[in-house]
Amino acid sequence: MLRTMTAILAFGALATPAMANEPVALGEIAYGPELIEHAEDFGERELDRLAGYLRTALERELAGELGEGGYTLNVTILDAQPNRPTMAQMGGTRALHSSSISIGGADVEAELVAQDGQVIETYSYGWRSMNISDVVGYAQWTDARRTFARFADQVSDSLDERAGSGS
């Protein structure tokens, strides 16, 4: 399986303020240009579904750290591919059927921003299935949702690590 996992520190630990007891608010979930281009194929309503899946994953993983008045996590879904055709795709192409399968996945990035606008940390994660036989039985956005869950876990672990180290 192709896994691209990177957490990139925007600044060194000495240049960042302590995160202990600082709440994190979920900011805007934006869409990257590639995703917007693909939305023409799979339908605009799918963007809202993807943002909802990502927000749910982040809220679940960051439950103990969410709040106002601290940092803001701004997230961008760069790209996503469904494992099964969307309604818009099936309506536009006779060859597609709801049982059609494909390799899905997503690419996501985020910035953790302090109240003064300083970017404290950036995150990036992308994942795709490598083998079409792996996606048999999957729902429409299974790989994208898996990507979002792993990304949220990565962000949560990073925030916990920063809070524990006081940087």
Predicted regions, residues:
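Bacterial N-terminal signal peptides that target proteins for export
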Residues: 1-6
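A structural "domain/chain start" motif
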Residues: 8, 12, 16-54, 70, ...
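Localized chelating/binding microdomains
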Residues: 22, 140, 157
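Short secondary-structure boundary motifs at beta->alpha junctions and helix caps
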Residues: 35-46, 118-154
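Short structured motifs
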Residues: 44, 59-60, 92-96
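Sec/Tat-exported extracytoplasmic proteins
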Residues: 54-66, 81, 116, 152-163
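Surface-exposed short loop/turn segments
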Residues: 68-119, 130-135
